[in-house]
């Protein structure tokens, strides 16, 4: 388990450093499976049902994580789960259309630090591991989500 978390952390660190250093490369270096099937990542996550289950687990972890739980104490968690499911569905190449606020607006008043953001990513990785999502699919999803950090980290 520790090795898996360490590997995931290393992969995320690489993904995030790519986002910081070469954002264009991170966005143009499409995963191999996406070239043949734009919905391959969506399918790897179990489509809408799998993403819904993943977001249920993930949001529950966020709410229970003492490092960041205070950021969610006044949040409608069911609404958050729905919004995140729609967003990840769209990001993964699924048929959903995320219609929530953009990331800058959604996080403007939250005071999210880099440490808060890293805790959130760790919770997402743990939820993906618990659902046995293949490591390569996890990395692809994290690579697609990584550019959002610029709008989420506000302090």
Whereabouts are the PLM-identified features?
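Core of compact, soluble alpha-helical bundle domains
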Residues: 25-155
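Positively charged n-region of N-terminal signal peptides that target proteins for export
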Residues: 1-4
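Signal peptide cleavage region of secreted peptide precursors
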Residues: 21-23
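Bacterial N-terminal signal peptides
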Residues: 9-19
């Amino acid at each position: 388990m520790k090795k898996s978390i360490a590997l995931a952390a290393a992969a995320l660190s690489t993904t995030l450093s790519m986002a910081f250093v070469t954002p264009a490369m991170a966005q143009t270096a499409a995963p191999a499976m996406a070239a043949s099937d734009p919905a391959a990542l969506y399918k790897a996550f179990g489509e809408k049902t799998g993403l819904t289950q993943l977001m249920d687990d993930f949001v529950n972890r966020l709410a229970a994580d003492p490092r960041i739980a205070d950021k969610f104490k006044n949040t409608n968690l069911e609404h958050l789960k729905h919004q995140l499911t729609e967003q990840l569905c769209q990001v993964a190449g699924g048929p959903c259309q995320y219609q929530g606020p953009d990331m800058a607006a959604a996080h403007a008043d939250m005071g999210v630090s880099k440490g808060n953001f890293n805790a959130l990513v760790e919770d997402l990785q743990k939820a993906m591991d618990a659902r046995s999502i293949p490591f390569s699919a996890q990395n692809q999803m994290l690579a697609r989500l990584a550019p959002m950090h610029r709008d989420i980290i506000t302090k």
